[in-house]
Amino acid sequence: MNRLIRSLCLACAGLFAAGLAQAETLRIGGKTFTEQRILTAITAQFLQKRGYDVTVTTGLGSTLARAAQESGQLDIVWEYTGSSLIVYNHIDEKLDAAASYRRVKQLDEAQGLVWLKPTRFNNTYALAMPEEQAEHLGIQSVSDLARVLAEQQEAEPGSTHLFAMDPEFAGRPDGLGPMSELYGLHFTRNDIRQMDAGLVYTALKNRQVFLGLVYTTDGRLKDFKLRVLKDDKQYFPFYNAAPVVRKEVMQRHPEFATLFDPIIERLDDATMQALNARVDIEQQTPQKVAADFLREHHLLDDGQAGQGGSQ
């Protein structure tokens, strides 16, 4: 009789624990820009359709999102290999995409963070110009740019070539200064125009600046007819995105190791750029773009996923 009671108690305890796991709310965090809002919406809707309870918080700066995840306030964040390598772990060694991923996976595991498989898209920095202007000047790469600028500055000393960028890149130790030194670019203080990253694209489109710092998966590059210059000396690090999950959450949900693979496998540069364009150019909401992406790839069986908590 006692053995039967003990068995029943153990069974009830198991059911109670399972119920707690099912009732757990997964906290998804995202950063300030369009791409992050889309990725968090995709993740939230994908998880909700599979019976998980989620909340979403977007609009976080990179360091704030990282700190929130390390302290246990966020469970899932889409992170970039370059951000973890350079900003969080202070590694300035030049690594290729695969080596970058292996290094951050190892380093962040010590912080209680688990990197899932990386996507194929690389949202790194790049320099861009209006396509027509770049074609006229014969500029395909950053080295071409350096050559043309040197020729023009020699022919017309004191000439300006306005360069638009966000304030962070202008001041960060792996930003404007080291890049200019590597390529032999010479910009004066009067050449530099600091502005919100989103305004750089409009300034380029309207020919208000000669050159701009952009992100390679931004949807406005194609629509605004901007040429991304080849980083032929490989200055910019790789920024491949991947879901990063707290280790405690992974221990409770080992299925997460492969659950997101259908999403990860479908995200490349062209796909991410097209998704971003639907928000930035077509003015669709990140939630709608996410739902359409999931439906297109048959990752929602009836298209009735929730919209992913508070934005």
Swiss-Prot record:
Keyword Nucleotide-binding: no
BP term (GO), one: glycine betaine transport
GO cellular component, one term: periplasmic space
Residues of the signal peptide: 1-23
Primary localisation category: periplasm
InterPro entries xrefs: ABC_Gly_betaine_transp_sub-bd (IPR007210)
Keywords from the UniProt entry: Periplasm, Signal, Transport
SUPFAM superfamilies hit by this protein: Periplasmic binding protein-like II
CDD domains assigned to the protein according to its UniProt record, in alphabetical order: PBP2_YehZ
GO MF annotation list: carnitine transmembrane transporter activity
Record field: transmembrane: none
Pfam families xref list: OpuAC
UniProt KW Transport keyword: yes
Location of the protein in the cell: Periplasm
Family statement: Belongs to the OsmX family.
Biological role stated in the UniProt entry: Binds glycine-betaine.
Protein name: Glycine-betaine-binding protein
Source species: Pseudomonas aeruginosa (strain ATCC 15692 / DSM 22644 / CIP 104116 / JCM 14847 / LMG 12228 / 1C / PRS 101 / PAO1)
Lineage of producing organism: Bacteria, Pseudomonadati, Pseudomonadota, Gammaproteobacteria, Pseudomonadales
